A protein has these predicted regions:
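Conserved active-site-adjacent core of cysteine acyl-enzyme catalytic domains
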Residues: 25-37, 52-54, 94-219
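Positively charged n-region of N-terminal signal peptides that target proteins for export
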Residues: 1-4
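Active-site-adjacent structural segments surrounding the nucleophilic cysteine of cysteine proteases
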Residues: 6-8, 14-106
């Protein structure tokens, strides 16, 4: 019994240690890159917060509790914007068996996050991947529809020059500027705007934890 307990403790420490290493590895984006790689012009950010969907977030995001829980944090913020009851990471994850250590050890795939979402809402949840650039543009145009919510899975490396995969809600689309408003749930980044084509390129990549491409979650 003692040996089994010891093995269990060692395994748990190993999992948490692995999670810590993963988080450190994904935090290699410099403060300068965080600021300069995307658009943060106050006037444009202010306009973006006034978009129909972004406005439902009330310019207030609950930041992810650690570097591995961007998916649950994105769901919690999105659910709050549409009036669902589960509006914290803990409530989103309760009963799902996911991230039970407090960390999502290797992160969640879009399919896994969709399963978590569907377990907590009566709304339809879809995973959209293998989109063409034109299809992505059409979805971004619909990202201002109050009846729809998008969560995007992308790699930071394409946009910021370093970093790993990440989830964040889409706050909307400034069509005249052809820019997407990303409600980044990581407090180091905070919400930002980026050219649609660059965001598509960051999404149109293969998830390192599987053999499928990243994509969008659509909740409607």
């Amino acid at each position: 019994m003692k040996r089994s307990l010891a093995f269990g403790v060692i395994a748990g420490v190993g999992l948490l240690g692995g999670a810590a290493l993963l988080i450190v590895g994904q935090s290699a984006v410099s403060p300068d890159a965080i600021q300069s790689s995307v658009t943060r012009a106050p006037a444009l950010i202010d306009s973006a917060w006034k978009l129909p969907v972004a406005a439902t977030f009330n310019a207030d995001l609950a930041w992810q509790s650690n570097g591995s829980r961007c998916g649950p944090a994105s769901l919690a913020n999105t659910f709050r914007s549409i009036g669902e009851e589960e509006t914290t990471e803990a409530e989103v994850l309760e009963g799902t068996g996911k991230c039970w250590t407090g960390y999502c050890i290797i992160g969640l795939t879009p399919d896994e996050l969709a399963d978590v979402a569907q377990a907590k809402t009566g709304r339809k949840v879809s995973v959209l991947r293998n989109l063409s650039a034109d299809e992505f543009r059409e979805h971004m145009k619909r990202a201002n529809d109050p009846g729809r919510r998008y969560i995007i899975n992308f790699t930071r490396e394409t946009i910021f020059g370093a970093g790993g995969g990440h989830f964040s809600p889409v706050g909307g689309y400034l069509e005249a500027e052809d820019m997407v408003f990303v409600l980044d749930v990581n407090e180091r980044y905070k919400p930002w705007l980026v050219e649609r084509e660059r965001l598509f390129s960051a999404m149109d990549t293969v998830d390192s934890d599987g053999d499928k491409k990243r994509g969008l979650l659509l909740i409607e």
